[in-house]
Regions:
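Structure-specific nucleic-acid interaction/processing domains
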Residues: 1-107
Length: 107
């Protein structure tokens, strides 16, 4: 088994604002959210340009995170490709579609 066999697709969302962000990880969801929140706090506290489109959702007071799917991938590319399917097929704030080789901007 490799670490990508334990892949997860998750969404961060705000129902009141109708905003959704899709991501993937091999970490636990709480551990991944720790990183999202650390980066978000740096963005807010230092007035930096947003690095991640999840910040739009994290700005909402009612945001939540949810496991969408456990995904047994062979490689990072496989996991990102699956993440990209959710990004393409759902309304979301993600600017980049994962798993396209080169970063593709969502239109």
């Amino acid at each position: 088994m490799n670490k990508y066999n334990f892949g997860k697709i998750y969404k961060i969302y705000s129902v009141s604002a109708n905003l959704y962000y899709y991501g993937s990880t091999i970490q636990s969801i709480p551990m991944r959210m720790t990183t999202h929140m650390r980066d978000y706090r740096r963005y807010k506290n230092k007035g930096l340009a947003p690095r991640c489109s999840s910040y739009k959702v994290l700005d909402c007071p009612d945001w939540k995170v949810e496991l969408v799917e456990e995904y047994c991938a062979e490689t990072k590319y496989d996991l990102e490709k699956r993440e990209g399917e959710f990004q393409k097929n759902n309304v979301c704030v993600n600017k980049n579609i994962a798993g396209n080789g080169k970063r593709k901007i969502k239109t």
